[in-house]
Amino acid sequence: SVGFKAGVKDYKLTYYTPDYETKDTDILAAFRVTPQPGVPPEEAGGAVAAESSTGTWTTVWTDGLTSLDRYKGRCYHIEPVAGEENQYIAYVAYPLDLFEEGSVTNMFTSIVGNVFGFKALRALRLEDLRIPPAYVKTFQGPPHGIQVERDKLNKYGRPLLGCTIKPKLGLSAKNYGRAVFECLRGGLDFTKDDENVNSQPFMRWRDRFLFCAEAIYKAQAETGEIKGHYLNATAGTCEEMMKRAVFARELGVPIVMHDYLTGGFTANTSLAHYCRDNGLLLHIHRAMHAVIDRQKNHGIHFRVLAKALRMSGGDHIHSGTVVGKLEGERDITLGFVDLLRDDFVEKDRSRGIYFTQDWVSLPGVLTVASGGIHVWHMPALTEIFGDDSVLQFGGGTLGHPWGNAPGAVANRVALEACVQARNEGRDLATEGNAIIRKACKWSTELAAACEVWKEIKFEFAAM
């Protein structure tokens, strides 16, 4: 007789376990599964659980040398997606022991590493992950977090203001530094390297760092406020990235920046550790995210990438603007904005949150609204994102007819007017335009900005 039962058997026999009670230490995943025609959802869900944990396509002799019951992923619930044909949400529980501590890289390699090319599935999307406190505690998380950042910058009770320097490619280092100085002098808190500014022939990184540091110190002296410029440390190797971060620290600047998806989670986590040890804030850009998260039925939802960033480490992350998008998008976006900032977030399917997430006092991340926004959007942005955010106006600062500094003044005046109105109990949703118009009366810079972008009409519903 044969020592073990060889052969291929259905995944659902081993990996679909609807009676399973999830443990507090399990990592839970919600997958949107689109099976191939003729594949039952239980088999598809079981296949996902198997391929992303202990399973392979056939029974193997070495299965007898370990305890599958202890280590296997389990598909414990399947529900059809309302309004979609042949789409299901498969819930999978993974034992904590399957994952290396403090490694976002390993977590993703396990959960989404292999299973997305699986033949039995037409498409697969990871919609959400529940990270148990036991695993959260193995991560350092953001270098500083929201409260420490405010204390470092001495800025309270309002969103922070930023601006991406444009044209993003082609300026010399000295002209780049000049643009930075004008923006900071006018009243912005931060300026930003574009995500694709690394170290190109027309502007090497060291020159840029030096001129930007000079701009920061001059603007601080002139305004009496703490200023920063997100110096992009992203590089072709981790060693080069660290070299840039070290140089930024030696210049005494407050913040550096990293592209966490193109740079990779391993590089990002190393940089985050360096930033915490050396008092640097870390701004995170999400370049490449849409490649992964844009398709509705395949890929990884951004809320998962956002959770991963909070674990890997970053003090700011770009998270969309909400403004002018569809209503549903707003709720979904605010769902992952809360996942980034709050300590404890309740399950809420209407906001796309599949699991209750307890971050057990891992520091929070400031969400960054950036892209196509201008002064008329300020009331909406203040209302939607609240104080713990960075509002970034690239063209909305540099496109001002009088130049960068007046563009910065216009944004700062608009923001202060909105914050004051909110604190006085006025409703930004209904009175936003009036608040901006009134502020124009005592700021010619704002009036000029409002004139340039007045065509873009903007109304939004109250929360």
UniProtKB/Swiss-Prot annotation:
The record marks K325 as: Transition state stabilizer. GO terms for molecular function: magnesium ion binding; monooxygenase activity; ribulose-bisphosphate carboxylase activity. Signal peptide: none annotated. It catalyses: 2 (2R)-3-phosphoglycerate + 2 H(+) = D-ribulose 1,5-bisphosphate + CO2 + H2O; D-ribulose 1,5-bisphosphate + O2 = 2-phosphoglycolate + (2R)-3-phosphoglycerate + 2 H(+). The modification N6,N6,N6-trimethyllysine is found at K5. Its EC number is 4.1.1.39. CDD domains: RuBisCO_large_I. The disulfide bond which can form in the large chain dimeric partners within the hexadecamer appears to be associated with oxidative stress and protein turnover. Its cofactor is Mg(2+). The active site is at K166 (proton acceptor), H285 (proton acceptor). Substrate binds at N114, T164, K168, R286, H318, S370. It is found in: Plastid, Chloroplast. It is an enzyme of class 4 (lyase). Mg(2+) binds at K192, D194, E195. Binds 1 Mg(2+) ion per subunit. Pfam families: RuBisCO_large, RuBisCO_large_N. Keywords: Calvin cycle, Carbon dioxide fixation, Chloroplast, Disulfide bond, Lyase, Magnesium, Metal-binding, Methylation, Monooxygenase, Oxidoreductase, Photorespiration, Photosynthesis, Plastid. Belongs to the RuBisCO large chain family. Type I subfamily. RuBisCO catalyzes two reactions: the carboxylation of D-ribulose 1,5-bisphosphate, the primary event in carbon dioxide fixation, as well as the oxidative fragmentation of the pentose substrate in the photorespiration process. Both reactions occur simultaneously and in competition at the same active site. The basic functional RuBisCO is composed of a large chain homodimer in a 'head-to-tail' conformation. In form I RuBisCO this homodimer is arranged in a barrel-like tetramer with the small subunits forming a tetrameric 'cap' on each end of the 'barrel'. Heterohexadecamer of 8 large chains and 8 small chains; disulfide-linked. The disulfide link is formed within the large subunit homodimers. This is Ribulose bisphosphate carboxylase large chain. It comes from Pelargonium grandiflorum (Geranium).
